[in-house]
């Protein structure tokens, strides 16, 4: 027969075990919810930005994930109205993701996106270049290192700008397997204090590959009107497919080997402008389209294509409500404890190559964080070219000496 003491111990252990399991379940639910919210935010941010980029009327390729990652590395250091604007512009407010939950959400995303030995290859890398001897808060560095897996590397933007440029481009080339060989073509400003970088690389083989022998020159109708001969790939197989009567478009999924990643094609009817579909899309509608896909025997014909793009991101982010981050009113005191930093520019490059074997894509994003001025908004006076001078008596107001220097 169990003693009272033994029963008490068993009861305590049961309570502790139950509480521990409840806590684990709570944290798992919270983690799942945070990841779902991050997915919604990144996708919605990408769709909002895509609409604006498409106004240029050109082919586009960019990485919502890469841009969102680099900008979020800055966002976690934002405070006040700067943080409010960035949270809204990056889609976090709409997705219900608080600023303090963003680092953990990205941490979980990086875990899920890790490549294994089978299927497609996806690599993501972050790095933060910091001006030598510039004081960055340990709390900010911890978030970058532990949650964003970011290296933190001291560099000298002031005296070694050319070397920094070459080092950045070499890093970009290495991560993207030479698909993108440069991000910056000249040294960054000597006032740069942080350069937050993200690079992503993807390579996947189609689960069902196209036969090169079936690739032929066929007409592709630009803007549904002007015809041009391009290489078109064809195959017949079962693929996830649907037709959406509201958007009046066909939706096709081509999976990559390993079934972890796939390419989704959205093809409007001939009499429907692509812009109509683009304007109607949202993170929720994309999710719904994917949920409606059903395995269907179908004849697929798509073009081989390569795209490269370096969109001017900054102006579109401002249109999307992120104004203060780029102004002298910016508050990034979560980075260094002071309000003397602002985002000077956001750089982005992306490419994709689609052929019979599969697809290869890469993107790189950079957020340039600068001092608002060299000396806390004081004007600078550098007499390094011809000037005049005079010596004046302040009491009498008379000029005692007057001259000019033209050569030294």
Curated annotation (Swiss-Prot):
Coiled coil: none annotated. Disulfide bonds join 50-249. Glycans are attached at residue 174. Residues 1-22 form the signal peptide. InterPro entries: Serpin_CS (IPR023795), Serpin_dom (IPR023796), Serpin_fam (IPR000215), Serpin_sf (IPR036186), Serpin_sf_1 (IPR042178), Serpin_sf_2 (IPR042185). Pfam families: Serpin. GO terms for molecular function: serine-type endopeptidase inhibitor activity. Keywords: Disulfide bond, Glycoprotein, Protease inhibitor, Secreted, Serine protease inhibitor, Signal. The record marks 372-373 as: Reactive bond. Specifically expressed in hemocytes (at protein level). One of its GO terms (biological process) is negative regulation of serine-type endopeptidase activity. Its main location: secreted. SMART domains: SERPIN. Monomer. Forms a covalent heterodimer with clotting factor C chain B. Forms a covalent heterodimer with proclotting enzyme heavy chain. Belongs to the serpin family. This is Intracellular coagulation inhibitor 2. It comes from Tachypleus tridentatus (Japanese horseshoe crab).
